[in-house]
A protein has these predicted regions:
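Sec-dependent bacterial lipoprotein signal peptides
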Residues: 1-19
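Kelch-like beta-propeller repeat domains
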Residues: 20-349
Length: 349
């Protein structure tokens, strides 16, 4: 497991949507390249979004096997990057860490390192107003990497991952709780164990799934409103429901997600090799729309000379109305490119 470089908290995108039903309501979309990431190319970074800026922190630079602890802010309206304060000296560089934004602050927790004990449990809070990192309580679930992070209902949540075993536990983070009690266990998740899964949040409801368990892609999919976990349709053609497309093959690990106008987008990742396709989730229908329609535009078609944009371990930003994909890895290639999906625009001929 430690030799595996794929990772999942992050995001990337491609083929345009094919309906899993016969509905043709959704347009194909177009990818637009934005200002390249100003830091070094990397994979396995962590990201969160707040106040109109996307933040990218940490990650892995394969050329020198460097684990990074820098942090950068992308001004979404201005299309430019600004370097923020690095994680403090006492915080290790890391990759495969969980992250979320909450009440105007960003949080990075857990992750993988090169040396024993291999994994981390420390939690760091970033205040953009002061450009200062502050240590919070260690993650109560213990050291791990490849966990899922999200925020709903005024709390942060982190769960699943890998600590030499595959995990399925979740914990809630309360930034206002006294030191020593900021993390509390959350019960009720009946999904499978996994590492490199993901979550996206629509209308303060988290949608959780994807990842892998012992080299098998996990196919269950859940919503969580801060109180109740609800099982949704699997992300595979696992039953006789005719609303599923025969090619309903979304399950993967080390993928990324973002939200645009109440729809969830999942892109790239590792599915028996790196991928470049993307799928859109409609929570009102509990259905996915994906990459089987030739009318849709893969990110690959706008990629530069590296020969294609298939990748895993990327990250994504989302403002709720705009979604971005950046960085990642394919073989020995590490990316610093940034793309935005314009979901309602047709590709130019």
């Amino acid at each position: 497991m430690k030799k595996k470089t794929t990772m999942g908290i992050v995001l990337a995108v491609l083929s345009v949507l094919v309906s899993c039903t016969e509905d043709d309501e959704y347009t194909q979309g177009q990818w637009i390249r934005r200002s390249d990431f100003d830091g070094v190319a990397r994979c396995g970074a962590s990201s969160f979004t707040m106040d109109g800026k996307g933040y990218l922190c940490c990650g892995y630079r394969g050329s020198n096997r460097d684990l990074l602890k820098d942090c950068w802010a992308y001004d979404i309206e201005g299309n430019y990057w600004t370097q923020c304060a690095d994680l403090p000296d006492e915080a290790a560089g890391r990759h495969q860490a969980a992250a979320f934004a909450l009440n105007g602050k960003g949080y990075v927790t857990t992750g993988a390192i090169k040396d024993e004990p291999d994994y981390l449990a420390d939690t760091w809070e970033y205040d953009p107003a002061s450009d200062i990192w502050t240590q919070k309580d260690d993650f109560a679930g213990g050291m791990r990497c490849g966990a899922i992070g999200f925020a709903v209902g005024g709390y942060g949540y982190v769960g699943t991952g890998f600590d030499d075993n595959y995990l399925k536990d979740f914990y809630r983070f309360d930034p206002n709780a006294a030191a020593g009690s900021q993390w509390q266990i959350v019960n009720g998740f009946e999904g499978g164990k996994r590492v490199y899964g993901l979550a996206f949040v629509i209308d303060d409801v988290a949608y959780v799934g994807f990842g892998e368990n012992n080299n098998t892609y996990v196919e269950d999919f859940y919503s969580f409103d801060g109180t109740t976990w609800t099982r949704l349709r699997d992300i595979a053609d696992t039953n006789d429901d005719e609303d599923y497309d025969d090619d309903y093959a979304i399950a993967r690990s080390s993928t990324v997600a973002f939200v645009i106008d109440g729809k969830g987008y999942v892109a790239t990742g590792d599915r028996n090799g790196v991928t470049s396709d993307y799928w859109m989730y409609d929570p009102e229908q509990d259905l996915w729309y994906g990459d089987a329609d030739d009318d849709y535009t893969p990110l690959t078609s706008v990629h530069y000379s590296t020969g294609g944009s298939s990748r895993s371990q990327a990250v994504g930003f989302s403002t709720g109305t705009r979604g971005f994909v950046l960085t990642g890895q394919s073989g020995n290639s590490y990316f610093d490119d940034v793309y935005e999906l314009l979901p309602y625009e047709l590709e130019d001929d």
